[in-house]
């Protein structure tokens, strides 16, 4: 599939401090956060003018699902627009708290674990053709996804009985199955619940829930871009070596605990391979595939260049080569500088604070944004595009139809209901349009519905 629909869903961690002490429960903080949303949307589950969905997920986690995008750079822009929207809710919530005499600071973290050991996710969605054999897709994809953390993990200070250690991935400790239809109970690598949000006879939606939430634009580009290339190879029937892992769940933890990428994991065939070797197998196949198919674009070149350079840098342990582009490396360097300056161990509580503060989405407070202000983060988006993404949907996918419909209905003060595939006016006629094709950004039926308001 040369043109694919992508979507990202990020759940955010939420907390509130009162002079450094927790004062409100996450439930109460979430209510303050969403008060403005509920006042206009009459619900804490709404679709926005940019085509995205914003809602309160299980356990008081705000979740932002990007609109459908058909290129990876646009997807990253819309994910960042989601951060900005939530930052706006945060500022608004703090103002309301202060007006009510509660001197609290509200924090939203774009990470995947909290101090109590709970995990919440970053879910990637890829539209794939229905005709392929899903089990083959999963078999080829799982070794890639288990080792992919090496190129796109967000990094984590993990507390263990033997003290704190730095790991590559936040989610690795919380994954318990390879393929499953549940997302919360068993936490698989790939979720098989079949909700394509499109024509079910033609498409299915691959739902990957093993990845970390990324702060870095370039890490996000690499995560989704490399996965897209692997999917294209599978769809084209490219012959791949059998890299099936003996135990993917053990392997994902072993890979996360080894910053060198050299530790061997056991394959089902009895062979052993390191995470670097597994990734190189996919990377070299992808380079060859792109050349043979003639599918080079600026984005594909960027993804392949960063993928190869990241593997080289990790293998040589020359992390300076990627310390503005890959989240786990950026955070690791930040922590190591701090530890050296203050002569402290990884187990020091202040190190755990830095780990968390890296993911604070408040741009004046978060450590990732401190690095960005200092020019120490590579970028692929610009701030104007991100600002536009808060209210303007992608113009080449179904999100445009949804966004235009919502904008018009709100301007005309009309009551309406939307989801990923339906647009409905709640008037006497109960007019509804079903939009099954996520690639379609122009539809006469929707134009008619909008014109009739």
Swiss-Prot record:
Binding site residues for Mg(2+): 9, 55, 63
Signal peptide: none
Catalysed reaction, written as an equation: ATP + [prokaryotic ubiquitin-like protein]-L-glutamate + [protein]-L-lysine = ADP + phosphate + N(6)-([prokaryotic ubiquitin-like protein]-gamma-L-glutamyl)-[protein]-L-lysine
Main EC class the enzyme belongs to: ligase
Matches recorded under Pfam families: Pup_ligase (PF03136)
Keywords: ATP-binding, Ligase, Magnesium, Metal-binding, Nucleotide-binding, Ubl conjugation pathway
Gene Ontology MF annotations: ATP binding; ligase activity, forming carbon-nitrogen bonds; magnesium ion binding; ubiquitin-like protein transferase activity
HAMAP family assigned: Pup_ligase (MF_02111)
Other remarks in the entry: The reaction mechanism probably proceeds via the activation of Pup by phosphorylation of its C-terminal glutamate, which is then subject to nucleophilic attack by the substrate lysine, resulting in an isopeptide bond and the release of phosphate as a good leaving group.
Protein name as it appears in the record: Pup--protein ligase
């Amino acid at each position: 599939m040369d043109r694919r629909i992508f979507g990202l869903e990020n759940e955010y961690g939420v907390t509130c401090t009162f002079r450094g002490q927790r004062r409100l429960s996450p439930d109460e903080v979430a209510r303050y956060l969403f008060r403005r949303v509920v006042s206009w949307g009459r619900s804490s589950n709404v679709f926005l003018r940019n085509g995205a969905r914003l809602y309160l997920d299980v356990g008081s986690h705000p979740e932002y699902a990007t609109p459908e995008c058909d290129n990876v750079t646009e997807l990253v822009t819309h994910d960042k627009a989601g951060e900005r929207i939530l930052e706006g809710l945060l500022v608004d919530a703090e103002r309301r708290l202060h007006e009510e005499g509660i001197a609290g600071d509200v924090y939203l973290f774009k990470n995947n674990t909290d101090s109590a050991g709970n995990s919440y996710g970053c879910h990637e969605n890829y539209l794939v053709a229905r005709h392929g054999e899903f089990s083959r897709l999963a078999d080829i994809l799982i070794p890639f996804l288990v080792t992919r953390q090496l190129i796109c993990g967000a990094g984590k200070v993990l507390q263990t009985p033997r003290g704190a250690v730095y790991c590559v991935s936040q989610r690795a400790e919380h994954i318990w199955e390879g393929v499953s239809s549940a997302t919360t109970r068993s936490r698989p690598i790939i979720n098989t619940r079949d909700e394509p949000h499109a024509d079910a006879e033609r498409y299915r939606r691959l739902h990957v829930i093993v990845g970390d939430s990324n702060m870095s634009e370039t890490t996000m580009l690499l995560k989704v871009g490399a996965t897209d290339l692997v999917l294209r190879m599978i769809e084209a029937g490219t012959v791949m070596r059998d890299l099936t892992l003996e135990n993917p769940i053990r392997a994902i933890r072993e890979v996360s605990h080894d910053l060198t990428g050299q530790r061997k994991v056991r394959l089902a065939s009895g062979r052993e391979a390191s995470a670097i070797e597994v990734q190189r197998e996919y990377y070299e196949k992808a380079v060859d595939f792109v050349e043979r198919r003639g599918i080079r674009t600026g984005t594909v070149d960027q993804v392949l260049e960063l993928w190869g350079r990241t593997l080289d840098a990790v293998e040589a342990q020359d992390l300076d080569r990627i310390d503005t582009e890959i989240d786990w490396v950026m955070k690791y360097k930040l922590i190591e500088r701090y530890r050296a300056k203050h002569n402290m161990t990884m187990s020091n509580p202040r190190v755990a604070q830095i780990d968390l503060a890296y993911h604070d989405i408040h741009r004046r407070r978060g450590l990732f944004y401190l690095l960005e202000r200092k020019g120490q983060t590579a970028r692929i988006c610009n701030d104007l595009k991100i600002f536009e993404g808060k209210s303007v949907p992608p113009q080449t996918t179904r999100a445009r139809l949804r966004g235009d419909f919502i904008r018009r209905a709100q301007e005309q003060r009309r009551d309406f209901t939307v989801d990923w595939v339906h647009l409905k006016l709640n008037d006497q006629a109960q007019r509804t349009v079903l939009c099954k094709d996520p690639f379609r950004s122009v539809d006469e039926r929707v134009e008619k519905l909008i014109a009739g308001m």
